[in-house]
Amino acid sequence: EGVEYSRRLAEKVKALDPSRYVINSINGWYNMFSSLSALVRRKRPAAPGSGLADTHKRTSGYINPLMNTVNRFMDLIVALPLVDWGTRAAFAAVDVAGYNYMAGRYAMDGRLYPRRVICGSESFPPEIARNWRRVKRLAHVIGDFTWAGWDYLGEAGLCTWQYGANQALYKPYPCILADSPLIDITGQRQAQSYLHEIVWGLRKDPYIAVRPLNHAGETPSKSVWRGTNAIASWTWPGCEGRPALIEVYADAAWVELFLNGRSLGRKAAGDRRDFKAIFRTVYQPGELRAVAYDRGGRETGRAVLCSASGALDLRVQPESTALRADGADLAYIHIALAGTDGIVDPLAERLVTVRVEGAGSLQGFGSANPLSQERFTDDTHTTYQGRALAVVRAGNQAGSVRVEVSAPGCQTRILVLPVQ
């Protein structure tokens, strides 16, 4: 039935616009289980209440935890003939075969189907280096997409690294976000996105990220949809003397890390190390500096993280300085708790209040905290990793909108945005 729908949908798209390429993205692992379930049901219908009757109805809430558990064997599983048997007819109906978590088939299917064009339509973020090597090596593989680029509401906790007792893949309320590791729900880039940028050859300078020092020594329950929970910060007040794990991403043969001018050593990086080097030290405030070198020892780039200094205060930065009076235009206002040098404190959690008056209204207000009982429709919200985001909607009348942002112990900030 699914194959027939694939064919009909592809034909409809072609009829509407022959210039469009059509892709059908299939999870071979999930499709294999569905195919087996269908075969079993045809041969021996399950009795009501047996627990087997609804096997075919199980969705990502059932299959994703299995994928998280057996990830190390995924390449072997998707190479099974049954995966090919269950997908070849559907792929034959489209221009591009979208492989969800089936990178283990890229090479073999290039031999089995020489005319098939393949795209990695969904893949695990931690596998970007390995998958991109395949994209560059195999001419019939045209690209790779990661799940997921931008965080979203739903599949709660899919990508979260949880500290404490061992947690299931999906988390109960108050977890509300998937916690995707590339761009958080407020639009802030995370460390994983910079690793992707480096793997793709789009960034020459290295990138430094630090595992949360407030959880130093703890072992998190991990998800294969997140490669790291490190963040680009060397500001960890109250964590002096704790062991620090530092990740440096670099498209370079070697990378050297310095703490307050003292070398912590030089380690291999680049493609042979999946573009990542790991350093360990003891936290002390100051400056972390990473220097990348080519094979000849010549510097190719550097990155620096400094600790915040001075008293924390509110930093408010709107993405736009004016709005259209159309009732729809939005201003995204980034709010952060930072030192006098503008460096954000990731451990700063304060209740922020946003008041909006005039020719606009507060459309939404929140943070990237995946576990929160606060509402996006309220005018108060607690910062997460020192940040929050307010969204102001313009009205239909020209004028100005006044935005007041306040937090305990901080100077109140006021923005006035013209609405024209």
What are the residue ranges of the model-derived segments?
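Short aromatic-acidic-glycine turn motif
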Residues: 267-269, 311-315, 355-371
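Short, solvent-exposed loop/turn segments enriched in Ser/Thr/Gly
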Residues: 327-333, 399
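Short beta-strand elements
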Residues: 302-309, 410-420
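Short glycine/proline/serine/threonine-rich loop/turn segments at secondary-structure transition edges
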Residues: 396-402
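Short, hydrophobic beta-strand segments
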Residues: 277-283, 377-396
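Substrate-binding clefts and catalytic carboxylate motifs of secreted carbohydrate-active enzymes
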Residues: 11-15, 22-328, 340-345
